[in-house]
Each structure stands twice: as structure tokens, then as C-alpha cells.
Swiss-Prot record:
EC number from the UniProt entry: 4.2.3.174
Gene: TPS1
Keyword presence, Amino-acid biosynthesis: no
Positions bound to Mg(2+) 2: D307, D311
Species the sequence originates in: Camellia brevistyla
One GO biological process term: sesquiterpene biosynthetic process
GO MF term (any one): magnesium ion binding
CDD domains for this protein: Terpene_cyclase_plant_C1
Entry binding sites for Mg(2+) 1: D307, D311
Name of the protein in its database record: Hedycaryol synthase
UniProt key word Magnesium: yes
Binding-site residues, (2E,6E)-farnesyl diphosphate: R270, D307, D311, R449, D452
Similarity annotation: Belongs to the terpene synthase family.
Length: 554
């Protein structure tokens, strides 16, 4: 992804012409430099949370509740963002509920669709046939469905769990979107329900950032006349306590980044410490993953600057030197680099050394080698794109995607994310699984790459950039830009289908690992949905503030 440049000089006196990207600066100044955790408030939250957790745990395991009531309780716990406290109990309940499920029960559309979504989210392959009773003899939706707003909203959310070959869910997706859009703001919806529908159409549950979606749902749930005050109280306390933890972690990361002072030496690069921490918090938000969030943030930051070096600054000759240095991964390779690259290379080696030391204390350093190898692979693929740009070469779409699945960083992000998990979860076998190039990791990478290609195409081509997947597809198939975008979005949807299918039991590896690959995929949907929100951080600024600064009123 090298930007346009003239005069490949490394050691000559003349500075080569560089076509800089002129990325927007950081939005945050010193906003996150200091933060003092209120220990008294933390303890107050924690003490009440422990009491409420036991009350809720008793609710989850209590007998005598109808299946529909139990599945609704599980849904509320998940949407409130507190289900991670009760994972074992919820899995036991779902196993029993799925084994006993009878589709001849007189369930309405809301309840059937809710069962479908919850079961699929947890790896149980419920058949689409459960929706047949809502279709007429011609296969069309019955008129009663169009009048059931809650049912349509539930079905809409369920369609995001589709896998390949489920044409009905594609039809249901298009149908529910059209119906719900026609009802928003109309006289047939209460303002509260209309607000829920509008949010769902903007961001689905399955593809959303769990912590942000929990905060949204809490605001809806507290207006629900049927709300459970214990659940609501626990959700608010849990969100606010975890927000304090995240804010403290962000402060440490932000100060570390300022002290590293890399951006002052490579000012062409995007300064995105806060956004990278936001990214890492999407990968895993739970309190036990604080080390993982720090590790992943640091690696993503270094990758971001490396990407910008290949994409928007380095000359081809400089980039070849840097690629070779990264393959050697040795401080002595620094001597061959221009000064600005020495700074970046030194930071890369030091950060990985620091990460390895931190993880070694917990017996988890074995994943660092895999992360380094993934970083080396990405840099090799960056150089391939730099060569293509230098030669004006437009690859076939297939050739482009083969390389793009590396530069999409799916392997590096997954490996680096696994490094931050508990040793009994992210075992050596988990890292070996990544080396097999599993379908789920490839699909996650494809989503990120193709969405980014569509959203950043105009801006990148304006400044000079290697042909993107959009350009390659247009040239190979002789189609317009809009036609190519339609085809790329079909590929993105198929990649989501693959992710959903890989999460159905029996899974290749533990669901405790796969959920983080899913979370990494969700980042693409949240950050790149309408525009490149990483390059243009004002797009996700409200998300950052909501997650790290604004507590929920108690």
C-alpha cells in the first residue's frame, strides 16, 4: 500500500518527493494523560455488584420457568452486558433448552426468532424451518407478520446469524428492513419502540461492539415497564465500574504512547492511540483481559505506523530495506536504514521485547513468536503492494485478494489477541490453529479488507495509491464502480456467513477463542460502516466518549 513518490533515494543528499496522505491529527490532545481511579467508588460498586450477581445467578438456575421466559432472561442478560458473569450457568441452561425445544409450540414470531438468534450465537444450529409457519402457501410472509413490529425486529436481528445456503434468511432480511423502515416515525410505533428500531437498523446486535450495544440497551431497558430492577441495577453498576478500569488502562496506554514519542519522529503517520485502545476493547472488554488490551493496543499502534510508512511515505528502495530489516528482527539491521526508519524499527523491537517480558511473568510468552512471524508476513505483503504501485500494475482480483488477506492483518490481530488470553484457553494448539489459515480468520480479514477498500477508495486514489480490490475488480470484469461495490458487499456478506458457520458446534477450537475472532470482525462493521472511522476519528469520537468517559446515571 505504498503512496506515490518520485526519486527513490536513501542515502543521497536530495530528499525524494513524497506524496503525503496528510492524515487528520489526533483529536484528543492531553485529554487522557491523567486519571485517578476513585478507589472508594470502585469498592462501593464492587461490593454491590457481588451481592446482585448472586441474586441474578439464582434467577438463572432457578427451575419452574417456561422455556420462552428463560430464553428471554438470557437475552436480557446478554444485551445488558452482564452475561459474562454467568457463562457457565447460561451454557448449561441453553444446552437443556435446545435439547427440549419443540417448534410446534405456539410461539409467536418474536419468541421463535429470539430462540433462533440466541441458539445460533451459542453454536446451536437451529433450522430455518422454524419460521415456516409465518409464511403462506406461496412462500410469502403472512400479513400478520407485517403488523407485528416486535416480531419483525426480532426476526431482523436473527437474520444476521445466517450461513451459506439459507435463502430464506436473505429474504427475511430484505423484508424486515423494508417493513421496519416504513414504520419508523409513523403513528403505529411508540417513540421508545421507534427509537429501538432506528438503532437496530443502524447497528445490528450480532455485528455491534458488545459494550457499546449494552449501553444502548440499558437506556432502552430502563424505559421498559416489564424491566427487572435487579438486572438493571447490576448492568448500570457493572458498566460504570468496568468503565473506570478501561479509563485507567487508557491513561496508562496514552502516557506510554506519549513517552515513546514516535509520532514526532514520523509525523506522516496517523496518531491513533485512543482509537487503537478502543479497537482492543472491542476484541475483549472483560476485566480479566487488561494485559491483553495493553498488548494488543501496542502492537496495533506499531502496525498502524508501519502501514502508513509503506502507504504514505516510504520510497520503494527504503521500503525494501525496511522489509529486510523486519525479516531479520535484529538491532544490527538498523544500520542500513534511513534515520526515520531507525526510529520506527527500534520502537518495533522494543515494544515486542516489552510485551514478551510482560507475558513471560504469566507464563504466556510462547505466543510472541507467532505474532512476530505474522508481522513479518504482513510487511512482505506491504512490499508486494509497493512494487505493484511502483510499476503501475493492477493485479487480477484473485491475485489481489491472496495478498490482501495478509495485509488485512487477520492473522496478526488474532495471534496478538490470543496472546492476551489465559494460558489454559490460548494454548499452543490455538496458535497452531491460526497457522492452518482457518476459514474464520480468513473471513474476518476479508471483511476488514473489502470494507476498507470500498470506504477509502476515493481518498486513496486521489493521493496516489496501489490499486485496491475495488479497482482490480472493475478492471478485470469491466464493470462500473457501483457495480463492483455491489459485488464486494456480496463477498462481505458471504464472509459473515462463513464466520457464523464456523461458530456452530462442533467448532474447530474453543468458543472462548472464536468469540474474540468474531469481535475483531465486528470492529470493521462499527468503525468502517459508513466511512473509514480510523483515518477520520471524528466518525467514532462519540463511541469513544460513550465508552470511556460518560458513565450511566444511577
Amino acid at each position: 500500500m505504498a503512496s506515490s513518490q518520485v526519486g527513490d533515494m536513501v542515502n543521497g543528499n536530495a530528499e525524494p518527493t513524497r506524496h503525503l496522505a496528510k492524515f487528520p491529527p489526533s483529536l484528543w490532545g492531553d485529554r487522557f494523560t491523567s486519571f485517578t481511579l476513585d478507589k472508594q467508588l470502585w469498592d462501593k460498586y464492587g461490593n454491590e455488584i457481588e451481592v446482585l450477581k448472586e441474586q441474578v445467578r439464582s434467577m438463572v438456575v432457578a427451575g419452574g420457568r417456561k422455556a420462552a421466559e428463560q430464553i428471554n432472561l438470557i437475552n436480557v442478560l446478554e444485551r445488558l452486558g452482564v452475561s459474562y458473569h454467568f457463562e457457565k450457568e447460561i451454557e448449561e441452561q441453553l444446552e437443556q433448552l435446545f435439547a427440549k425445544f419443540e417448534d410446534n409450540e405456539d410461539y409467536d414470531l418474536f419468541t421463535i426468532a429470539l430462540h433462533f438468534r440466541i441458539f445460533r450465537q451459542h453454536g446451536y444450529k437451529m433450522s430455518c424451518d422454524v419460521f415456516n409457519k409465518f409464511r403462506d402457501s406461496n412462500g410469502e410472509f403472512k400479513e400478520t407478520v407485517s403488523n407485528d413490529v416486535r416480531g419483525m425486529l426480532s426476526l431482523y436481528e436473527a437474520t444476521y446469524l445466517k450461513i451459506r445456503g439459507e435463502g430464506f434468511l436473505d429474504e427475511a432480511h430484505a423484508f424486515t428492513i423494508a417493513q421496519l423502515e416504513s414504520l419508523v416515525g409513523g403513528p403505529h410505533l411508540s417513540s421508545d419502540l421507534s427509537e429501538q428500531v432506528m438503532h437496530a437498523l443502524k447497528q445490528s446486535i450480532h455485528r455491534g461492539f458488545p459494550r457499546l450495544e449494552a449501553k444502548h440497551f440499558i437506556s432502552f431497558y430502563e424505559k421498559d415497564a416489564a424491566r427487572n430492577e435487579t438486572l438493571l441495577r447490576l448492568a448500570k453498576l457493572d458498566f460504570n465500574q468496568l468503565q473506570l478500569s478501561h479509563r485507567e488502562e487508557l491513561c496508562h496506554i496514552f502516557r506510554w504512547w506519549k513517552e515513546l514519542d514516535l509520532i514526532s519522529k514520523v509525523p506522516y503517520a496517523r496518531d491513533r492511540a485512543v482509537e487503537c485502545f478502543f479497537w482492543s476493547t472491542c476484541a475483549y472488554y472483560e476485566p480479566q483481559h487488561s494485559v491483553g488490551r495493553a498488548v494488543l493496543t501496542k502492537i496495533v499502534l506499531l502496525l498502524s505506523v508501519t502501514d502508513d510508512t509503506y502507504d504514505a511515505y516510504g520510497t520503494y528502495d527504503e521500503l525494501k530495506l525496511y522489509t529486510n530489516a523486519v525479516q531479520r528482527w535484529d538491532a544490527s539491521a538498523m544500520d542500513e536504514l534511513p534515520d526515520y526508519m531507525k526510529t520506527l524499527y527500534r520502537a518495533l523491537l522494543n515494544v515486542y521485547d516489552e510485551v514478551e517480558r510482560d507475558l513471560a511473568k504469566q507464563g504466556r510468552a510462547y505466543g510472541v513468536h507467532h505474532s512476530k512471524e505474522a508481522f513479518k508476513e504482513i510487511v512482505r505483503s506491504y512490499e508486494i503492494e509497493a512494487e505493484w504501485f511502483k510499476e503501475g500494475y493492477v493485479a487480477s482480483f484473485e491475485e489481489y485478494m491472496k495478498n490482501a488477506l495478509v495485509t488485512s492483518t487477520g492473522r496478526l490481530h488474532t495471534t496478538s489477541c490470543f496472546m492476551g488470553l489465559e494460558a489454559d484457553v490460548a494454548t499452543t494448539e490455538a496458535f497452531e490453529w491460526i497457522l492452518t489459515k482457518p476459514k474464520m480468520v480468513a473471513a474476518s480479514g476479508a471483511i476488514g479488507r473489502l470494507v476498507d477498500d470500498v470506504m477509502s477508495n476515493d481518498e486513496e486514489q486521489e493521493r496516489g495509491h496501489v490499486a485496491t480490490g475495488l479497482d482490480c475488480y472493475m478492471k478485470q470484469h469491466g464493470v462500473s464502480k457501483q457495480e463492483a461495490i455491489v459485488e464486494l458487499y456480496k463477498m462481505i456478506e458471504n464472509a459473515w456467513r462463513d464466520i457464523n458457520e464456523e461458530m456452530l458446534k462442533p467448532t474447530a477450537i474453543s468458543m472462548k477463542l472464536l468469540i474474540h475472532v468474531l469481535n475483531l470482525s465486528r470492529i470493521s462493521d462499527v468503525v468502517y460502516k459508513y466511512v473509514d472511522g480510523y483515518t477520520h476519528p471524528e466518525i467514532i469520537k462519540d463511541h469513544v466518549i460513550s465508552l470511556f468517559e460518560d458513565p450511566i446515571p444511577m
